[in-house]
């Protein structure tokens, strides 16, 4: 099987940036799970995007959560390389029908500023049923609607 050389170079460079440089481990890369890096046409600044599909939290405050470890990761990343992360939510009606409602977003700086610093057990998502998944919830009113 032959692979397109251009595609392989793009993939290699992407992994080098994400896992090598942004992963903050130059000798041995650490996977970062960053969804995208974008260049703002208005400011010429680069931003990181974290994208999740979620429905509103069932308990008060109504809002969207993020794993505490992820919140810390994005805070560390901003301190070390200076890039802001935007947290985009593909808001769905519920977990059963997954009906799309709208796109919502917030900077991770604002998420941390407004979220309730109370550990809430998050959904199962990609973890095992026997592990803990503590999250912090940011009230919905702090998320903007993406046009």
Regions picked out by a protein language model, each given a short descriptive name:
Residues 28, 37-41, 79:
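Short, conserved, surface-exposed binding loops centered on an aromatic residue
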Residues 34-57:
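Conserved catalytic cores of phosphodiester-cleaving nucleases, focusing on short active-site segments
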Residues 1-32, 80:
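Acidic-basic catalytic patches of nuclease active cores, encompassing PD-(D/E)XK
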Residues 54-76:
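Mg2+/Mn2+-dependent nuclease catalytic core
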Residues 75-110:
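Nucleic-acid nuclease catalytic cores
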Residues 31-33, 44, 48, 69, ...:
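Short connector loops at helix/strand junctions that flank enzyme active sites
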């Amino acid at each position: 099987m032959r692979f397109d050389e251009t595609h392989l170079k793009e993939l290699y460079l992407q992994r080098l940036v994400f896992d090598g440089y942004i992963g903050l481990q130059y000798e041995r890369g650490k996977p970062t799970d960053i969804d995208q890096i974008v260049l703002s046409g208005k400011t010429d600044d680069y931003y990181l995007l974290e994208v999740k599909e979620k429905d509103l939290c069932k308990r008060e405050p109504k809002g969207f959560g993020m794993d505490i470890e992820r919140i810390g990761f994005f805070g560390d990343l901003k301190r070390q390389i200076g890039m802001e992360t935007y947290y985009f939510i593909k808001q769905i009606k519920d977990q059963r029908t997954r009906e799309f409602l709208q796109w919502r977003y917030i900077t991770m700086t604002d998420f941390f500023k407004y979220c309730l610093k109370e550990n809430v057990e998050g959904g199962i998502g990609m973890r095992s049923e026997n592990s803990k998944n503590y999250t912090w919830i940011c009230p919905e009113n702090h998320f903007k609607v993406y046009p």
